[in-house]
Regions:
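N-terminal membrane topogenic signal
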Residues: 3-19
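Hydrophobic, membrane-inserted alpha-helices
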Residues: 22-25, 82-91, 113, 203-212
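Short, hydrophobic transmembrane alpha-helix segments
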Residues: 25-42
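Membrane-interface helix-boundary motifs at transmembrane edges
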Residues: 35-36, 65-75, 119-130, 189-203
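Membrane-interface helix-loop-helix junctions at boundaries between adjacent transmembrane segments
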Residues: 69-73, 88-147, 157-164
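Alpha-helical transmembrane segments of multi-pass integral membrane proteins
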Residues: 107-111, 116, 131-152, 172-190, ...
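Predominantly late transmembrane helices and immediately cytosolic-facing juxtamembrane segments
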Residues: 116, 225-238
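Short aromatic-rich membrane-water interface segments that cap or initiate transmembrane helices
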Residues: 162-175
Length: 238
């Protein structure tokens, strides 16, 4: 366990260093991405997500083996049939109920990010722990909303979030501020639960995410986080 924590500690240190250097370079060159065509930037981000980022999802096959052993299921095809069925079902429901499905997806994503990025420090499974996994992981959702509100709303609009909900976010901006504050509380909660051992890991985690979302557009910030922090952590955990 100590060795794993040491690996995670080195990883977050180098990731934060990479974030600071990339951000400083961007600021000093008056935004290094400003000269880049938006289409090219999106293509690069998509390439990174499909190559590095999705690779951690491809390892679901490894997790499937563990899950099938737990339930004593020998037929591996059952997992893939259910996996594909759920994926198709989500796309179908999304096309019918865009706002509901997107909000549900963001909730699940927040919980996933919170759980996967904390599990190496804390193994608790209480109901309160589950709530705080969700709260902590929501930083990935609310940081871009806080720093780049209009740009993030455009992304949500593309993903079929209703006009009514978009208007609600514009008028009730305090909701975003409150949720961002709560995500900080989530970090403090797990630091406390871990008796403030390895506190620097949680601090650098939060700091790097905030820096990325302050300096870069939501797409770039998420790509860097997803590919070089979250996905690599997931791979290490396996």
């Amino acid at each position: 366990i100590k060795m794993i924590k040491k690996i995670y500690g080195k990883h977050i240190f180098y990731f934060t260093l990479f974030t600071v250097v990339l951000s400083a370079t961007t600021l000093l060159t008056k935004n290094i991405f400003s000269f880049t065509n938006e289409t090219i930037t999106l293509f690069i981000c998509l390439f990174l997500i499909l190559s590095i980022g999705i690779s951690h999802g491809a390892l679901d096959n490894y997790k499937a083996n563990k899950l099938l052993k737990i339930y004593s299921i020998k037929n591996k095809s059952i997992f893939f049939i259910i996996y594909i069925f759920i994926s198709v079902l989500v796309i179908f429901v999304w096309s019918l109920y865009g706002t509901f499905t997107l909000l549900a997806f963001l909730l699940v994503a927040s919980y996933h990010f919170g759980l996967e990025d904390t599990s190496f420090l804390h193994k608790g499974n209480s109901f309160l722990d589950q709530i705080f996994y969700l709260i902590k992981g929501s930083l990935i959702i609310f940081a871009p909303l806080f720093f780049h509100f209009d740009e993030t709303l455009k992304i949500f609009e593309t993903l079929m979030l209703s006009k009514a909900f978009l208007t609600f976010l514009e008028i009730e901006h305090w909701v975003i501020n409150l949720c961002l504050f709560l995500s900080f509380i989530g970090y403090i909660y797990f630091a406390y639960k871990n008796k403030f051992d390895d506190f620097e890991v949680l601090f650098l985690d939060m700091l790097s995410i905030l820096i990325l979302n302050y300096i870069f557009s939501p797409i770039i910030a998420f790509t860097v986080y997803f590919c070089f922090l979250h996905s690599i952590r997931h791979i290490i955990s396996l």
